[in-house]
Amino acid sequence: MSRISFGKDNVQDTKGKIKMKKNYQLILDSEISNLNGRRAKLLLHSCCAPCSTYVLEYLSRFFDITVFYYNPNIYPKDEFFMRVNEQKRLIETMFPDSSVGFIDGKYDDDRFYEAVKGLEKLGEGSQRWYECVELRFKETAKRAAEGGFEYFTTTLSISPHKNSQVLNELGADIAEKYGIKYLFSDFKKKNGYKRSCELSAQFRIYRQNYCGCVFSKNEREIK
């Protein structure tokens, strides 16, 4: 299990050195430009329908997208299926021509609890969160490699509460191991989060009030 210290705007490596934050929006712009109009296959890990609204609106202009909904951290089980159904409904509403695909990831909460064992009391943005993201990224990268996708990425960076540097560095490391590319991104840029709220309201998407796991739910209720 890797141990990395990270805050909202920076990351410390295992030697305690602060890594300079990169502008991942500029990196994404450059990657899209280098495609020269070619529509590469992208497997998009979606954490939830609301966060995917803007990301789908944005990236569907440049990529052939399949959404992969794999979030075994969601609690309780009924909540998981509610979020899955909202994701499906959003895709069907935004893309009635079926131009965006969908893969329904298995609800396997045992894998999540095993991944965060011993870290249950740590809060959002902690090592517990890192292990949760790593679990989901590994499964996404595996599916992407098996499915012949050129890239994978996630909707997670759209949240103002998620550290884009941690997400991108982790994604790149995992992608390399599976022989594919990670699409660097920071979807909160260009008013992405604001746009996601507008689109969620437009499509009447259910917006949950906690990240997903039982620990984040309890932390939210305490606040």
Model-derived regions: residue spans:
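Nucleotide-activated chemistry modules centered on ATP-dependent adenylation/adenylyltransferase
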Residues: 3-6, 15-54, 59-223
